């Protein structure tokens, strides 16, 4: 929820509500990766997420995911009870991540992304420049996701543990983000479940004429319905109840007999 909940009890209450509203997974992150956000060091990130994970595994009955690109955070999060490592770096941002993923036995989400030169910026998410240049966006994302898949499989991660994420909003222009969303189902030919995270992102705001993040709820629900129509397996959202209901109706309409 973008850091909206700071107190541990508030976080647990929010997570319980999300589960009641229909969430199948709770994703915990200690560093914002939205454009313009500043990198958090490992110790600070651990201090933010480990108490939350330890509490949540006792309080909710769905898997906990750790959203991190740092191997040490991933390792300790799994030790604390996380069952999924959700890496915005696709196991490429930290050289130790593939081994940590393999040894953990956790499910892994490999997101397409391109790492900026951190000697030139203190933000992990590129939104302009050469990192956002592509010929065919789907072909390139497919190829670069395959690199991530090969990395973790070489370390020992098995196919049944891998989930892929096209990385909407990461190292892509608005136009490329929209094209990638339109064609996201083409990535199924890699043979893995797809996680799509577009909730309240800039591309949604752009399609709504430039609306700010507080006015993107309906657009997000439309994107969720589109994801259902494309047989996307996992959708990451902020507003669980509304999106779960929208997805249920969309799925029913597609399969109603």
Language-model regions: role of each:
Residues 13-29:
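Catalytic domains of carbohydrate-active enzymes, especially glycoside hydrolases
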Residues 1-14, 33-51, 55-63, 68-71, ...:
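Active-site-adjacent loop and "lid" segments of alpha/beta metabolic enzymes
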Residues 19-24, 146-161:
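Phosphate/pyrophosphate-binding loops at sites that engage ATP/ADP/AMP, CoA/4′-phosphopantetheine
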Residues 23, 168, 240:
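Active-site metal-binding loops of divalent metal-dependent hydrolases
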């Amino acid at each position: 929820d973008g850091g909206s909940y700071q107190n541990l009890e508030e976080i647990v209450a929010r997570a319980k509500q999300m589960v009641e509203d229909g969430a199948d997974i709770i994703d915990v992150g200690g560093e914002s990766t939205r454009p313009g956000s500043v990198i958090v060091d490992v110790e600070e990130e651990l201090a933010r997420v480990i108490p939350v994970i330890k509490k949540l595994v006792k309080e909710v009955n769905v898997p906990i995911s750790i959203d991190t690109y740092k191997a040490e955070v991933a390792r300790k999060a799994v030790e604390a009870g996380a069952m999924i490592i959700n890496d915005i770096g696709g196991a490429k941002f930290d050289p130790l991540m593939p081994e940590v993923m393999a040894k953990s036995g956790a499910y892994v989400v490999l997101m397409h992304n391109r790492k900026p030169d951190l000697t030139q910026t203190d933000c992990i998410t590129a939104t302009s420049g050469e990192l956002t240049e592509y010929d065919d966006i789907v072909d390139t994302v497919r190829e670069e996701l395959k690199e991530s898949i090969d990395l973790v499989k070489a370390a020992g991660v098995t196919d049944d543990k891998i989930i892929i994420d096209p990385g909407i909003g990461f190292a892509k222009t608005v136009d490329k983000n929209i094209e990638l969303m339109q064609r996201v189902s083409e990535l199924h030919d890699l043979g893995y479940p797809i996680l799509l995270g577009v909730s309240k992102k800039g591309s949604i705001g752009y399609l709504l004429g430039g609306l700010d993040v507080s006015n993107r709820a309906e657009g997000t629900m439309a994107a969720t319905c589109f994801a259902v129509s494309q047989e996307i397996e996992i959708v990451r959202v902020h507003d669980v109840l509304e999106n779960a209901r929208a997805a249920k109706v969309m799925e029913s309409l597609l399969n109603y007999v």
